[in-house]
Amino acid sequence: MHQFVRVGFLVAALGTVAVTSAASQLLEQPEPDRSTSDPVMLILRGIANSESPRGQLDDGAALQYAWYAGFRGEVLDVAGNTGPDSLQVRMTLDRIRDDPSIAAIYGFSGGGYNARHVWAGLTAAQRERIRRVIVVGSPGVAASDFPGMPYVVIKPDPREGHMAGPKALLQWEAGPEAPLELGE
């Protein structure tokens, strides 16, 4: 009798471990990537420095924001040195002209200043495809810099500092308990 009880207990314990393990794995699965057919939010980095030679940005928070906003985020992998003829502006204009799935622009710091130049360089038809413009940490950039765009979000630097801007924007969109990475 005692052996049957022990075996029964062991089977129940193993079953509990298996169910707990399976549930744990389900919880740890990241959110599925947005389909390549989903609209794209093109994310523009800030200016480069010695720590971020390709441009400053909290990539994770910016991509998470795009996801929460209903877009597939893509970080344009070039520093946001500013100006209408900068490499970032030229690359962004080329991407928008060549890729009809781009439906939003997110600019951080120097990328936010460049978002103005990008908007000015778009044709009326290209502007109609853009559904949202986001600018974070770019003092002096205003919604009026994007005429005809009904959905513009301009966020100043938070108290935590310039580099905390993308995370603060994410928490504004998704709430203060927003996970820092998809799937958390």
What are these regions (language model features)?
Residues 18-28:
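Membrane-interface motif at the C-terminal end of an N-terminal transmembrane signal
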Residues 8-17:
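Bacterial N-terminal signal peptides
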Residues 154-184:
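C-terminal catalytic histidine-bearing segment of alpha/beta-hydrolase fold enzymes
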Residues 26-101, 160-169:
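Active-site catalytic motif of lipid deacylating hydrolases and related acyltransferases
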Residues 89-164:
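Serine-dependent carboxylesterase/thioesterase catalytic core
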Residues 1-9:
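Bacterial N-terminal signal peptides that target proteins for export
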Residues 45, 79, 137, 155-158, ...:
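Residues at the C-termini of beta-strands that transition into short coil/loop
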